[in-house]
Amino acid sequence: MDGSLYGECGNYIGPEIESDRDSDDSVEDEDLQEPGGSNGWITTINENQNIVLPEDKKYYPIAKEVYGEDVETLVMDEDEQSLEQPIIKPVRDIRFEVGVIKDQTTTYVSTLFLIGLMSNPALVRNVALVGHLQHGKTVFMDMLVEQTHRMSTFNAENDKHMRYTDTRVDEQERNISIKAVPMSLVLEDSRSKSYLCNIMDTPGNVNFSDEMTASLRLADGAVFIVDAAQGVMVNTERAIRHAIQDHLPIVVVINKVDRLITELKLPPRDAYYKLRYTIEVINNHISAASTNAADLPLIDPAAGNVCFASGTAGWSFTLQSFARMYAKLHGVAMDVDKFASRLWGDVYYHPDTRVFNTSPPVGGGERAFVQFILEPLYKIYSQVIGEHKKSVETTLAELGVTLSNSAYKLNVRPLLRLACSSVFGSASGFTDMLVKHIPSPREAAARKVDHSYTGTKDSPIYESMVECDPSGPLMVNVTKLYPKSDTSVFDVFGRVYSGRLQTGQSVRVLGEGYSPEDEEDMTIKEVTKLWIYQARYRIPVSSAPPGSWVLIEGVDASIMKTATLCNASYDEDVYIFRALKFNTLPVVKTATEPLNPSELPKMVEGLRKISKSYPLAITKVEESGEHTILGTGELYLDSIIKDLRELYSEVQVKVADPVVSFCETVVESSSMKCFAETPNKKNKLTMIAEPLDRGLAEDIENGVVSIDWNRVQLGDFFRTKYDWDLLAARSIWAFGPDKQGTNILLDDTLPTEVDRNLMMGVKDSIVQGFQWGAREGPLCDEPIRNVKFKIVDARIAPEPLHRGSGQMIPTARRVAYSAFLMATPRLMEPVYYVEIQTPIDCVTAIYTVLSRRRGYVTSDVPQPGTPAYIVKAFLPVIESFGFETDLRYHTQGQAFCLSVFDHWAIVPGDPLDKAIQLRPLEPAPIQHLAREFMVKTRRRKGMSEDVSGNKFFDEAMMVELAQQTGDLHLQMI
């Protein structure tokens, strides 16, 4: 059998055919044929048909083929960008501000005219509107905005005002102001002369008094808005003291005068008594707050520094403007000032003789203010509200006003606004008051610079600021930061004192920690944009002259609270403006953490922005790692947490229950001299502690006495006011924990026992240790307060190597702690001053609510001219959480309260008494509170429950202590 006929598997394949052989030969010939040759239907070899490996394939054209030879292309690796950063960032537009319609930005004067007024400081007035909550500051601003803009801030349909300077959505929802917002308005006086009035509308709630502090720093005067019905309330009192301390002139606007007519329904004579009483109370507070009351002008309508107004009805006047209106109405040429001076006080008009006299006419009569001002005002209100059209027409005609027939078809409130605004005209009287009693930036420069600038008076910068020199060195004081619409960065708001700030200019940004000796807190930034801030819109400008307020972009990166801007190229020493001095303290704190731990960096960044946005807010990290926020009260912290969640971090945040800050103090002198040796056993410090004199801590905090005084000044002050001996008064080394701290360190050593040169050599180290200890006390790491530390003995090594700061600082801190613990230590808690408005039948319930919370009433008096009572009380801050809700519940919502920090008080009980047993879920007795507060505070901070004596007492000190007391139980101290 022929094997070639079968395959490998035995299948028959048959013999080879001739045609198959020819086909194979032809294929071999084709493979050998040259390219371009002709061989049947195949003519060329296409390279694209060759087999190409996957890694060699070309899927897309190269960049040169697409863009050409002249275009440079850059290729970045895929891992150059973090995973958290999106390739295309979404546009962040957080709607936290109220939008503005284009028509609402149109003013009666051109923008160029407004900018031109900025260059003439004599035509500029910088003021802040301050006052109590709901006294009408924002609505009064609405009236001024309406008179300068082609718009109406009043909605006739729902009888509500726009609240133009409440730019945040939550401000509109809560019906309170949270942030201070400026506006620059061109107002005309009675002679039709235009002035640029930079006005800052500040919050009236005492929780946000830090905004008022930042505003007063930029202002040359304070305009107090006082409710005619309520009178002077707690925030007005505090604002008066604040303005006096800042050396600012004061003018008053008695607002809501129509409440005396429509709500209280007082007769005109009683309304006059009510207004006069309000002015007397203001003058009493001014006199009480001033150290030299003789230099302060009293508030007197006859002097022109009082304006009567109703923001809701859209009218305002002074006695001078009312007298001018009478002169114009009757066409009589008269001395307006003399006539105005007779419209206030016990002055009567005698119609028979046509003269004014201090005695009433025969048969009786009303005072001139009642006869010429209140009675016509009452007549307008009564007739418009009574809807007597004919009588209204007659009354308005007597005053020279005619309204159209369509006007009388309006509702009562719009008709009242129209009638009053037609009678009283524009706010020219208010402008006259500002021009006459508030100095221009040039006139106020010396007083402002002396109060806020830390440099010397013999420097060129000081002279330029006093002169408001536009060609001098640039100096800008920044006190406020406003977030942009995406809340990623801030624009800063400040006042130019000298020089001219321009866009594109490089400036040095000096922080609060800057000094010519330590330039670490300094950066150089470029000003990218400048605006005039107009609440809901901004006017771009290219430069800002001295005396102007300006909003600045591009310099916020290193600013936390306040800053000083100066020329980047200026070579002389530059000092900063002082940090803001607030009239309250942030004593309420809460801890926060993100719901998702991976979002902690976002929350930390949000907390940093919170610190920028809120002047008094303090954010810090405890030793336990928790992030805490300190604020003035519950409302303040609520606003902060809302902004943290919705604006600045956009993460879900968990918030702990609020707690309070404590202080540590002593009530007796140290029971023995306490000493501590340095680690190298070459030095030894001996110290005792004792309480400070009553009132001294407040004097230090208020700046009545300063550690920067020389020894003679300090000696005279302490010797005359606190009866210190001259040697002790001149031995003061430092205040602690800072220059305005409420603790004092004295060198009470004898020159015969201690080498003075060696003591002076280690003075700085001992002071640092003392201030470190005063900042964090031994009980629960809270600041020490009201303690005097005396160095009674010291053994200092003569070799500098053995008495270095590393040896002396911790030793000074330790001996201060031991002296403190041997002086009967106590805890101090913050206490609120509470002012409650209530009807008389709710006073008993208020006493009950306060007594349950360790509070007590100091006075309850009727509010003059009203059916309400004013209850004044003190309440520990730690007991205040939920107090307002509790109060409203027990009074059926009829009582309204405001609370503000007032003083520190000692907590009942001994915090070191280990015999006290704290039981969970049970209220502690009053005498156990100090122990409970200390233990819980230490737990929260991640510390051990008890104070360990081994940490603060040397072994030799413990032995001596045991010998004197016969007990070593003090290890628990």
Swiss-Prot record:
GO molecular function: GTP binding; GTPase activity
Occurrences of domain tr-type G (ranges): 122-408
Location of region: Disordered: 1-40
Compartment annotation: Nucleus speckle
Binding site for GTP: 131-138, 201-205, 255-258
Tissues/organs with expression: Expressed in flower buds, open flowers and siliques. Expressed at low levels in rosettes leaves, cauline leaves and stems.
Gene Ontology biological process terms in this record: mRNA processing; RNA splicing
Keywords, sorted A to Z: GTP-binding, mRNA processing, mRNA splicing, Nucleotide-binding, Nucleus, Spliceosome
General function of this protein: Splicing factor involved in pre-mRNA splicing and component of the spliceosome.
PANTHER family xrefs: 116 KDA U5 SMALL NUCLEAR RIBONUCLEOPROTEIN COMPONENT (PTHR42908:SF6), TRANSLATION ELONGATION FACTOR-RELATED (PTHR42908)
Name assigned to this protein: 109 kDa U5 small nuclear ribonucleoprotein component GFL
Protein species of origin: Arabidopsis thaliana (Mouse-ear cress)
